[in-house]
Amino acid sequence: MENISTTSDHQNISPDKMSDFDKPAAIFAAVVLGFAGTGVAMGMPLLVGSMADSLGFSEKELGWLASSDMTGLLIGSVITSLFVAKTNRRVLAAIGLLLVILANYFSTQNAELFPLMLSRLSAGIGAGICYSTCTASLAGSHNAARTFSILLFVLVLMNAFIFYIFPIITERWGVNGLFMFYLFEAVPILLILPLLPRHCAQETDEITAVTEADISIDKTKIPETLPRLCLVAVFSFYLLVGAYWAFIERAGVAADLSSTFISGTLTWGQIFSLTGTLLALWLARRFGQSKPLLFALSVMIVTMLILAIRVDATTFVFSIFSFSFFWIFIDVFQLGTLSNIDHSGRYAAMVPACQGAAQAIAPTMAGILLSYQLGYSSVMIMCALATAVALYIYFYVYRELLQVAPDVADSD
């Protein structure tokens, strides 16, 4: 069986052992690059609603369009994971940004279903390259919980702005205004690419473990199957994210909630989720990453089951706030867990691929359920089941780590 060498603790690593990716400028560049990689995925509810209103697509067709974006995210992430260890990351990021710019422009030029699906696929590929380069670069830091908390904190702020500004843009320019927003968002990011380190200094998959006292070396062998199982869990959890996030706006409309109420709830839900990044960092230092992750997944299952029973103003608000908070919370720990195992970014670069694959499949699955008149409760039950699978996998991984690498199992 293959093995990976990993660390027992990285937090007190000495300055001379810091990588280029620990530098504030590098973290800043990677985080800003994440804007272009996650904008469509995080703004998906309002984008889907805008395409429905502006272009008149059915729910099944909207599922295909959402899946096109997410399939592109998968393809871009896989491409990046294959080349990120050896290719200049500035070049990768530039290619991704140019694809985002061109594809969003072409999305405004043809409103027919198939050409628009191709444009959204291309935009997704560009976003996948950007996001994978972002996560692989942040994984090079020796304080994963901190760097990914910073990333998600900033992305939540950006997403709150998106939920505020998108209804205004849609009312004036329709869905083409949203495509142009993503285009103009990507252009200035090209200017900060020189701040991004070109390569990962670590050429191998082995990671030297530095003890808390920073005085001895400890190499712990972890079965290769464990990080791979973590990627499967990411995929399973993002089936929830893809289905819920693509159709929660439509579920609110079906429950006769006003568009103002829906967009306002989405906006405040994102603002509230900022506390998730801060709490995640505090809990990681106090309890490690695994236990809070298991708790958060359990709460997410309960949230989906409540929404499956009834969608009204109360359950809609509860689900948005719970989902927004724990989604960010869970992402911090998922990314942090893989980064504790592998600083080279190989597995972290695969996270967007797993997210993209799940989010490519999930809207289509949800759309099929809805096309059979099974209602939004069937979508929420599907989300709960997918999250339960992720919970089981992470529980198994945690138990195995307690046996082979207890310091990593409860690492922050």
PLM segments and residue spans:
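Extracytoplasmic gate region of multi-pass secondary transporters
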Residues: 45, 226-267, 271
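Conserved MFS/SLC helix-loop-helix module at the cytosolic interface between two early adjacent transmembrane helices
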Residues: 75-112
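Helix-to-loop junctions at the C-terminal end of transmembrane segments
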Residues: 76-89, 276-289, 370-371
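Cytoplasmic helix-loop-helix junction between adjacent transmembrane helices
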Residues: 119-153
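Intracellular juxtamembrane helix-capping segments at the cytosolic ends
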Residues: 129-142, 328-342
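Helix-loop-helix hairpin linking two adjacent transmembrane segments in secondary transporters
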Residues: 141, 150-201
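C-terminal transmembrane helical hairpin of 12-TM major facilitator-type secondary transporters
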Residues: 287-334
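A late C-terminal transmembrane helix in Major Facilitator Superfamily
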Residues: 341-375, 383
